[in-house]
Regions:
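A short aromatic-anchored loop/beta-hairpin motif
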Residues: 1-125, 129-186
Length: 186
């Protein structure tokens, strides 16, 4: 029997016609995936009304040296909960290494470190996450809802939000314009 394929440290790309507008052109950085379920942070959209400085001020943290970076819409689950995906040069007590590709942190410590100029070299912020129960993601993948690509650091930290989905497909050698939501038999 083959070992199960877990997707931590990879990107999920929504296939055209995924059928859920919340995930249209979604790029999800997978952080946890095992037999009990999966958790990923969406990187395909940003929140229109709040930047990183606004978030810090709401938490009574002076922005200091932090850039006023966009806040990504991490997903529909717990949209008020904040997450930072970042390089491994910073780690807090509750930080989670994700397959050696990036680190996930969700405490005030990382926000304070970023504001003080002592945080990770590269990072992205998000509110909410995408979550799946045990076997749920696998079912969606069998229905051709998602495409998997390696967790490329450049796509995570450097790609512009509105081009990230297409760039991720192209980095895998796939032209997303040629994809369809329909399946057939030969």
């Amino acid at each position: 029997m083959d070992a199960p394929l877990f997707l931590s440290g990879q990107f999920l790309l929504a296939m055209p016609g995924i059928g859920d507008p919340r995930f249209d052109k979604a790029v999800i950085a997978m952080c946890v995936h095992d037999e009990e379920g999966a958790l990923g942070i969406g990187l395909g959209r940003v929140t229109p009304r709040i930047g990183f400085h606004d978030l810090l001020k709401q938490l009574d943290i002076a922005p200091g040296e932090a850039p006023n970076a966009p806040i990504h819409q991490g997903g529909p689950v717990e949209p008020q909960r904040g997450f930072i995906l970042h390089t491994s040069d910073w780690g807090g007590a509750d930080s989670i290494d994700v397959a050696g590709r990036w680190v996930l942190s969700a405490t005030l410590d990382i926000l304070k470190a970023i504001a003080e100029g002592k945080g990770p070299r590269r990072w992205v912020a998000a509110l909410g996450y995408a979550g799946w129960g045990g076997g749920q993601l696998e079912q969606e993948m069998r229905r051709h809802g998602w495409f998997v690509t390696p967790g490329d650091e450049n796509l995570l930290y450097e790609s512009e939000v509105d081009t990230r989905w297409g760039n991720a497909f192209r980095s895998a050698g796939v032209d997303p314009r040629l994809l369809t939501a329909e399946s057939g038999t030969a």
